[in-house]
């Protein structure tokens, strides 16, 4: 397995090291290439992501990312647009996959959360984040600005098919989230596509929620969901809420996936670079390790993905949450569990 590793900034390299430790405990064929991408490189020479970087990344089977960001040193938006979004579009990461699971031993902010175990499939390369917009008369009382949400049948269908395949392998329920009563053109495209693709998956139950209703149900009845499929903007909102109800983003992993396999997909923890605790050895690497499990599953290694997830579930359930986290100790415990 040829693995591109982007440790990134802050705690990113620390948690990524533990994810690699766990990967090497279950596989002996991993060949890694480290990439200096993120705030450190940008502050040093102004580079974000070059064509040479992209060409080199494409030579790998997958990408493991730690975290990107340097609040206070790099203005907001520069790394997001110039590195993360550029990589997403260049490598056609059209599926953003975000599992949400409440583990035993983890406290949800919800009083009676029930069983939380669902996945959000978010479209990643269209919608309101394509940069299709503009502004005139900026800074005046007559300023006009617009952002156009771009939706194509091709883009929506490939994500919807991915979601149906996922639902078929899980509890066989798919929920489309949109705002079709107001966004009649883009929403209509998504609804029609779901209705048509659903005919090929008769065993999958399909329902629909408006985005406002879905945000409520994630709080009041999260166990109703199995697989949620939605567009880029609504998915951005739902995935962060999903992380919150399942105990916080410290346990949230994600995948940015080219479902065709043409380009390497990227897997990362959802949390940020947390520069305030970087270098102290107290960052929780669990989300990074879960990202590594997602990476293995994407590459067809289901057995080892399940082994890692099982070890994590047992470790999380047995933690003394009154004691501080040790980054390396968490990785060591997971490795020990895998080797026992």
Swiss-Prot record:
CC cofactor: Mg(2+); Mn(2+)
Annotated EC: 1.1.1.85
Any one cellular-component term (Gene Ontology): cytoplasm
GO biological process: L-leucine biosynthetic process
Binding locations of Mg(2+): 212, 236, 240
Single GO term (MF): 3-isopropylmalate dehydrogenase activity
UniProtKB keywords: Amino-acid biosynthesis, Branched-chain amino acid biosynthesis, Cytoplasm, Leucine biosynthesis, Magnesium, Manganese, Metal-binding, NAD, Oxidoreductase
Record field: catalytic activity: (2R,3S)-3-isopropylmalate + NAD(+) = 4-methyl-2-oxopentanoate + CO2 + NADH
Coiled-coil ranges from the UniProt annotation: none
Binding site for substrate: 88, 98, 122, 212
Superkingdom to which the source organism belongs: Bacteria
Record note on cofactor: Binds 1 Mg(2+) or Mn(2+) ion per subunit.
Enzyme class label: oxidoreductase
Pfam family, one: Iso_dh
The keyword Nucleus appears for this protein: no
Listed InterPro entries: ICDH/IPMDH (IPR050501), IsoCit/isopropylmalate_DH_CS (IPR019818), IsoPropMal-DH-like_dom (IPR024084), LeuB_actb (IPR023698)
Sequence positions that bind NAD(+): 272-284
Localization terms from the record: Cytoplasm
Site (described: Important for catalysis): 129, 179
Magnesium listed as a keyword: yes
Role this protein plays: Catalyzes the oxidation of 3-carboxy-2-hydroxy-4-methylpentanoate (3-isopropylmalate) to 3-carboxy-4-methyl-2-oxopentanoate. The product decarboxylates to 4-methyl-2 oxopentanoate.
Family: Belongs to the isocitrate and isopropylmalate dehydrogenases family. LeuB type 2 subfamily.
Alphabetical list of PANTHER family matching this protein: D-MALATE DEHYDROGENASE [DECARBOXYLATING] (PTHR43275:SF1)
Protein name as annotated: 3-isopropylmalate dehydrogenase
Recorded name of the encoding gene: leuB
């Amino acid at each position: 397995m040829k693995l591109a590793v982007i440790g990134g900034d802050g705690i990113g390299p620390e948690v990524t090291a533990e994810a690699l430790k766990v990967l090497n405990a279950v596989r002996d064929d991993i060949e890694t290439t480290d990439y200096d991408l993120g705030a450190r490189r940008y502050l040093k020479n102004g580079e974000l992501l070059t064509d040479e970087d992209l060409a080199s990344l494409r030579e790998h089977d997958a990408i493991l990312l730690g975290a990107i960001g340097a609040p206070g040193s790099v203005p907001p938006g520069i790394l997001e647009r110039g590195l993360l979004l550029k990589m997403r579009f260049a490598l056609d990461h059209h599926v953003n996959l975000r599992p949400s699971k409440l583990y035993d031993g983890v406290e949800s902010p919800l009083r009676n959360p029930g069983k939380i175990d669902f996945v959000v499939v978010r479209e990643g390369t269209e919608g309101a984040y394509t940069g299709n917009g503009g502004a005139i008369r900026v800074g005046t009382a007559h300023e006009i600005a617009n952002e156009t949400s771009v939706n194509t049948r091709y883009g929506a269908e490939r994500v919807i098919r991915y979601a149906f395949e996922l639902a078929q392998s899980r509890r066989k329920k798919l929920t489309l989230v949109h705002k079709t009563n107001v966004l009649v053109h883009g929403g209509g495209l998504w609804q029609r596509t779901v209705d048509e693709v659903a005919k090929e998956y008769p065993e999958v139950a399909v329902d629909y929620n408006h985005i406002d209703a879905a945000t409520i149900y994630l709080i009041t009845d999260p166990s109703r969901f199995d697989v949620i499929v939605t567009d880029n903007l609504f998915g951005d909102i739902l995935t962060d809420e999903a992380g919150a109800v399942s105990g916080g983003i410290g346990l949230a992993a994600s995948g940015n996936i080219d479902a065709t396999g043409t380009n390497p997909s990227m897997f990362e923890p959802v949390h940020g670079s947390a520069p305030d605790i970087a270098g102290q050895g107290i960052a929780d690497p669990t989300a990074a390790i879960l990202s590594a499990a997602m990476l293995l599953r994407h590459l067809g290694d289901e057995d080892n993905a399940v082994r890692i997830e099982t070890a994590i579930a047992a470790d999380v359930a047995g933690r003394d949450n009154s004691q501080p986290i040790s980054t390396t100790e968490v990785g060591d415990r997971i490795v020990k569990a895998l080797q026992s």
